[in-house]
Amino acid sequence: MVSSGMYKMDNGKPCLNNCFPAKSLLRLPEEGRGHWIVVRKGSMKKGAAKASTEGQESQKKVSFDTGLKKISRRDSQADVLGHILDRSFLLKHHSARKPSDLCTINVSGMKFSKAKEKDFKHFTSVIYINASENLLPLDVFHTFPVLKELELAFNGIKMVYVKYGDFKTLEFLDLSFNSLTEEAICDLGILPHLRVLLLTGNGLTSLPPNMAVKEQEASMTSLTSKKYILRFPALETLMLDDNKLSNPSCFASLAGLRRLKKLSLDQNKIVRIPYLQQIQLRDGSGDWVTEGPNPQKELQPQMWIFETPDEQPNYTVLPMKKDVDRTEVVFSSYPGFSTSETAKVCSLPPMFEILPVKSLKARNQTLAPPFPELRYLSLAYNKIAKEDAVLPAALFPSLCELVFHNNPLVAHTRGIPPLLKSFLQDRLGIRLVRKKLVKPKHHMLMPRKESRKVKTYIPKVPKHSLVPHHLNMITDSPPSSLMPEPEHSTEDTSHEALFANEGPEGPSLTHRAFVPMPPICSDSTVHSEAVSHQSHTAGLVSSEHPSDDDAKSTESIFLTQVNELPSSTAHRENLEAVNDQRRPSTAPRETKRTRRKQTATSLHNKYDGYEELLTVKPDPAFLEPKGIQKNAQALHRMLKQPLICRSSKPRLDTFQKPYVPKEKRAGRIPILPPRKTRAQLLDDILIRMRDPRNVTEAPLGTVLQRRAQQRLVNQKQYREAKRLLKEFRARYRQLVRSSLRTVFAASPPPRPPTRRALSAGQPKLGRFLEFMDEFCQEPTASDSKE
């Protein structure tokens, strides 16, 4: 064996390999000594031919000038060399050290046109590749050992070169928005584990008829026997939306896919679903029956023969008598149909070559339904306009959901069509979708940060007392039971001192506070106050922090409950009498005076403004309502309907608006003039025709204030305005003079003596006449010329 050594190639780069490979011990004798040289030269010639063709194409596209051909060729070569997908680029682009560390590859939009296939063998962990928006073919990626998902959208792929053994683990293939042909789709059928195939937007007008089955080539030993191989053995999802499929034969091409579960044919030109029925031929060769070798007869609709197997289906597809292009389903109960006959012959058009017998021979079956495992079929955005065009979907045994929204069938109607609802939905349980499903929006979940959580504890705000601070300072004094009553003079002096400290305007701003009026206390509060005066306890509760008992004791009363008030006052007087008996009888007169003052002040402070309620007598005709609800209702009724007697005296302190009665003005209906007859209308027209004068109306001020350039344009109009103004001045002067003469009763003497006499005798009238003469001056010569 020859050991490996260093050698240099034509480009000068060293390479660790054998310059002359070792001879194989199992080499065939037909090969000569220089066989490897011939193979090497042939590969070099093929590479040069490809490079020349690519250079010519790029040269034609870039420029048509002969002088720029060399520049364009250099640019194309540099561009190709710079956009080659290889091992070094993948490691650098994904920041990986070893090829085995890389699991996914994303090179979308990199404008790659070539790739080194040998470098991809080292990427033993790559299972997903996204190479969209490039110019790479499919066969470039066959050297990835464990590749499962491949996306090659927008790559301009037309043909596919795949061999047996390539893409052994590929399960997902996206070839959307390319330019695939029917042959390329057939070549994809040899992928053994392909489950999802996306062929969106490839401009397909039809599908290959042998898409599900491939006929194997006959060997040299057995020329008579034929074998068939299934294509797409593991395909479950097929997306053919956004194409140009219109022929119903596409269903016949796809019906042989035995494991297909989801089929999407959205945004095509499909008009109907054809009836699909398995057909078996008379002879066992697998070929269609023909009457002769004449090629013209092969183009005509062929005669298909139904053989009756052991298990006869309950329906049969027959051509319609009126329209040969359409078919109809005939069930076994149809009159004239007998299952005892050995064979049925019918002529169907070639486009309904439905489920050919080749697929049955591959699985050794005699009869198979169309789409045996299809569960989801989408026909949205097509041209289906009739209900019977969708009914053949009932022959698909595993169909669970049928989508047909945005079709003419449901564009102008509401609800599911009745025939489809009763036959497909109610009987077969197929879910029919006639409206586009709106996907719900994802719920936005805001992450909760523990740092933003409020953990501080805010203490409760204590309740403040209703009595202000300066009143607490005054009332903080020992109870009257512990110290003797002060004299009247001392009380006056204390009040005067307090008034002097606070000033005539009341307490200072720092001690002022909003003090609500205290409510009228009930007899319970009076009793509690009397008991508090009797208590000899030394501990007193401050006014700033009142106890709960004090807060509960301050309850309001209803003003209508006046029956208990006299008893409460009597009870209060009794308590005060008991307190007076306990006091020492040193000054009986002073105690009597203070007692009277206390009763007067207590009544005056508590019931200020409500003294009449203490002495009022109840109305004998008034029925006292029982219960708090009746009292509340009576009070609400009195407040809603108050009996107020307003005084007749006018209030002079307020501004009063005089009463002005409004007059109702009814609009007068205008009286239409009498309708003129046709003779009167003709007379008016003739009168207008006889009078050729054209009257032009224009404001006098605007005509006189125009500029010199505009005056030249309308010179006639300007002269007419000057003449009218001169005439107006003359008439106005004459009118003023005649009116003055009648007022002063003066004889009309000549003009100069009159002016002197008036100016001498009556100075005011003379000045007025001079003013009028100056105002009404005659136009000058320049104005008259103009």
UniProtKB/Swiss-Prot annotation:
Q: Which InterPro entries match?
A: Leu-rich_rpt, Leu-rich_rpt_typical-subtyp, LRR_dom_sf
Q: Could you tell me which residues belong to the region Disordered?
A: 474-493, 524-604
Q: Tell me a GO biological process for this protein.
A: response to X-ray
Recorded coiled-coil stretches:
714-738
- The answer to whether keyword Hydrolase applies is no
Q: Where in the cell is it found?
A: Cytoplasm; Nucleus
Where are stretches of biased composition, namely Basic and acidic residues? 570-583
Q: What's in the keyword line of the UniProt record?
A: Coiled coil, Cytoplasm, Leucine-rich repeat, Nucleus, Repeat
- Ranges annotated as biased composition (Polar residues): 524-537, 554-569
The principal location of this protein is cytoplasm
Q: Where are the LRR repeats?
A: 146-158, 169-192, 193-214, 234-255, 259-280
Membrane spanning stretches: none
Naming one, the record's GO cellular component terms include:
cytoplasm
Under PROSITE patterns, the record lists: LRR (PS51450)
Give the function comment from the record.
Answer: May be involved in the response of cells to X-ray radiation.
Name by which UniProt lists this protein: X-ray radiation resistance-associated protein 1
Tell me the classification of the organism that encodes this protein: Eukaryota, Metazoa, Chordata, Craniata, Vertebrata
